[in-house]
Amino acid sequence: MKYSEAEKKLKTAGCYCIEDGSRHPLWYSPLTHKQFAMSYHRNEEIATGTKHQISKLSGVKL
């Protein structure tokens, strides 16, 4: 799965970007009330461990 595909799923679930950091954009999930980092490289594949971490923090199955 690419970051762009994950971003679409997260936006559909209500997650949104709260800050464009210098290294990674920070996102917020209203489902879990937690923040998590994404990547600016939208065309790259997400590593398996990173995908699981984003899924866990966001509450959205990727």
What does each model-identified segment do?
Residues 2-20, 28-62:
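Basic nucleic-acid-binding interfaces
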